[in-house]
């Protein structure tokens, strides 16, 4: 199927990824990991909720953790729209499409609407959020990974093509993609609304499942310092994938798993993707440089493990192919 262009006159104006709502069995352990380890700021905590944000974020939160005794899960993926008028347009659009959608309330946010996307991912859109001065210029308080902002998420889905079509209709632009060699059979799509390469990635796999959240830091040295800081805090075993560089997006990265198993990427080096005549970059599925330009492949768990969305049934992927894993790589060396 040909690669379609994004809708340049979308029904409402989504501006960026806003926030992610995740589960936590122990909010104090979660706080230690994100605040003391990664260097995020806590903006609110009570017995059932923990709100955090990164150094450059003037809004109240980009991560919310809710006390939850069941299996680890993701409750919501949040996006920002330009203003409240766009929320009304969104509600009208989804009602017209007969996609269940409702207004709701969340602490520290303005009007919010909830719905599920075509992959079954629970979404919410808001236009406003409480604000206060960020820690950006309080350099003495920059610790851990010195994370600047929540940049993107990656989600595994059983049907990448349908997710791509759905988000393209909402104005998300394709910047890079993975396809089966010699075809446009989509295995992964990197989609954006803000200035750089992605707000959300949909990749082929059992889903819907949140693969990771990604926090941007301005320098490569911060990625390495984050690893050192986590080790000094006794959190070295939380590393999920060691430092390397992705071909797709050009990110220099490290991955951790938080106390509940949610995967977190700390990265730098994405590039701007702005001009209207820029074409998306294609990667063959067989080209392993898309995942790592150098270094070892990811371990098997990196490809198959993730965070389920609450009350959502997992579906087997429509496309089948075994990834090149660290275990496979080491076996060939033996």
Roles of regions detected by a PLM:
Residues 2-10, 16-25, 68-158, 177, 186-191, ...:
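Vicinal oxygen chelate
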Residues 2-32, 36-92, 96-102, 306, ...:
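The feature marks the first
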Residues 10-11, 67, 143-144, 203-204:
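Short, flexible, glycine/charge-rich loop motifs used to bind or transfer phosphoryl groups or to couple energy/partner
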Residues 12, 18-59, 104-107, 114, ...:
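Core segments of cupin and vicinal oxygen chelate
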Residues 40-73, 121-130, 176-211, 216-220, ...:
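Conserved short beta-strand elements that form part of the metal-binding/catalytic scaffold
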Residues 62-79, 137-142, 213-217, 279-288:
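A signal for specific C-terminal beta-sheet/loop modules enriched in small/flexible residues
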């Amino acid at each position: 199927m040909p690669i379609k262009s994004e809708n340049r006159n979308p029904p409402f104006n989504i501006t960026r990824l806003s926030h992610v709502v995740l589960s936590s069995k122990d909010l104090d352990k979660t706080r230690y990991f994100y605040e003391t380890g990664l260097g995020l700021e806590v903006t609110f905590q009570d017995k059932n909720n923990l709100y955090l944000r990164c150094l450059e974020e003037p809004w109240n939160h980009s991560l919310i953790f809710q006390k939850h005794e069941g299996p680890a899960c993701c409750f919501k993926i949040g996006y920002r729209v330009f203003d409240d008028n766009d929320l009304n347009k969104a509600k009208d659009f989804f009602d017209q499409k007969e996609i269940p959608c409702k207004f709701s309330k969340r602490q520290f946010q303005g009007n919010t609407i909830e719905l599920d996307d075509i992959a079954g991912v629970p979404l919410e859109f808001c236009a406003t959020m409480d604000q206060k001065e960020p820690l950006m210029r309080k350099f003495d308080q920059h610790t851990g990974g010195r994370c600047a902002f929540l940049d993107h998420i990656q989600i595994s889905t059983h049907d990448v093509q349908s997710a791509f079509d759905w988000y393209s209709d909402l104005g998300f632009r394709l910047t890079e993609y993975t396809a089966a060699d010699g075809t446009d059979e989509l295995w992964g799509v990197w989609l954006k609304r803000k200035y750089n390469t992605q707000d959300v990635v949909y990749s082929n796999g059992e889903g819907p499942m949140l693969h990771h959240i990604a926090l941007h830091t301005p320098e490569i040295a911060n990625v390495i310092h984050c690893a050192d800081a986590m080790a000094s805090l006794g959190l070295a075993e939380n590393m999920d994938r060691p430092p390397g560089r992705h071909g797709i997006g050009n990110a220099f990265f490290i991955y951790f798993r938080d106390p509940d198993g949610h995967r977190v990427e700390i990265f730098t080096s994405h590039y701007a993707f702005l001009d209207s005549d820029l074409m998306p970059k294609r990667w063959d599925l067989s080209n392993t440089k898309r995942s790592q330009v150098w270094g070892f492949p990811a371990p098997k768990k990196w490809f198959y493990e993730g965070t389920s969305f609450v009350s959502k049934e997992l579906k087997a992927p429509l496309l089948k192919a075994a990834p090149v894993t660290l275990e496979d790589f080491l076996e060939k060396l033996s």
